[in-house]
């Protein structure tokens, strides 16, 4: 295998691109894909400071690394979910990454915000763990960005993540979710920051390769609550399709974004309010996070 760029020995083959790259030119390719995502969707500028949500995994730390290398001002946000040793190790990876580069890392503890760590929340509410976790993450990312003055939050969602989410939404025809399936969500209220996904053009394999080549130390273990998650099953289905027809995930996601998503965008305006309990944005009187926190308090007290 020869590198498409220089003709030297390739270290990585990308079947969906019908190309192979040596290590230096793969890193160049990776950074160009991120730059294209940022440019195409006007995600942020060099005048802004970006809050990068990091989990200690390969995707979010790879994203933080790319943004640093490209000269963006950044700060990290780690959400401590309180998931046993997994959270301790993942937090340590984020702290080590930030310390080695002299970067700011903000830490928010879910237990302080919702009243209990995620394992206890799951037991108390009997709702799917990923549901309570996702709700808490979205709320705390937005709140932390507002409190610290960051206009945009960047997450490490990759092509595989986005294709699997879209697959689940289409399979169940969750038409409310489809308009929000986007690499960049604008601020629609003074108390909502922008949310962007600069890695959406890159696969999980590609982010893993970048992290390895850049020597990024990340947590390899999956979240213990991920076992049996529907999203994992969706990824496995798409993996089989990708193996049979390279580029399927890309075509599925990008076809939706380019041609189908506009048809699902809501015509009516959603009226936003400030939660009467916490002041964050909601469509009702009390936000879903405050309802969750209240339920946890009642069932654990």
Explain the meaning of each model-derived region:
Residues 1-27, 33-36, 42-50, 178-301:
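ATP/NTP-dependent adenylation/nucleotidyl-transfer catalytic domains that generate, transfer
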Residues 2-179, 188, 192, 201-214, ...:
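ATP-dependent adenylation/nucleotidyltransferase module used to activate substrates
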């Amino acid at each position: 295998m020869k590198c498409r760029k220089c003709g030297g020995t390739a270290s990585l083959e990308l079947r969906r691109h019908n190309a192979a790259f040596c290590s230096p030119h793969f890193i160049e390719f990776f950074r160009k894909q991120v730059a294209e995502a940022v440019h195409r969707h006007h995600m942020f500028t060099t005048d802004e400071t970006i809050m990068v949500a990091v989990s200690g995994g390969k995707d979010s730390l790879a994203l933080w690394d790319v943004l640093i290398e490209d000269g963006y001002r950044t700060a990290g946000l780690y959400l401590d979910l309180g998931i046993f040793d997994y959270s301790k190790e993942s937090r340590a990876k984020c702290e080590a990454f930030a310390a080695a580069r002299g970067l700011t890392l903000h830490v928010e503890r879910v237990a302080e915000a919702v009243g209990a760590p995620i394992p206890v929340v799951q037991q108390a509410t009997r709702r799917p763990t990923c549901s309570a976790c996702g709700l808490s993450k979205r709320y705390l990312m937005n709140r932390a960005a507002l409190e610290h003055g960051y206009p945009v939050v960047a997450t490490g969602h990759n092509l595989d993540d986005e294709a699997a989410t879209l697959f689940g939404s289409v399979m169940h025809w969750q038409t409310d979710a489809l308009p929000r399936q986007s690499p960049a969500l604008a601020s629609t209220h003074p108390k909502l920051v922008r949310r962007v996904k600069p890695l959406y053009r890159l696969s999980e394999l590609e982010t893993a390769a970048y992290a390895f080549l850049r020597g990024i130390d990340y947590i390899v273990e999956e979240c213990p609550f991920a076992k049996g998650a529907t999203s994992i099953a969706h990824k496995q289905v798409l993996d089989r399709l990708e193996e049979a027809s390279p580029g399927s995930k890309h075509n599925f996601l990008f076809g939706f974004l380019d041609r189908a998503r506009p048809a699902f965008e809501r015509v009516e305006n959603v009226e936003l309010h400030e939660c009467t309990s916490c002041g964050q944005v909601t469509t009702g009187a009390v936000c879903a996070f405050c309802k969750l926190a209240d339920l946890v308090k009642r069932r654990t007290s």
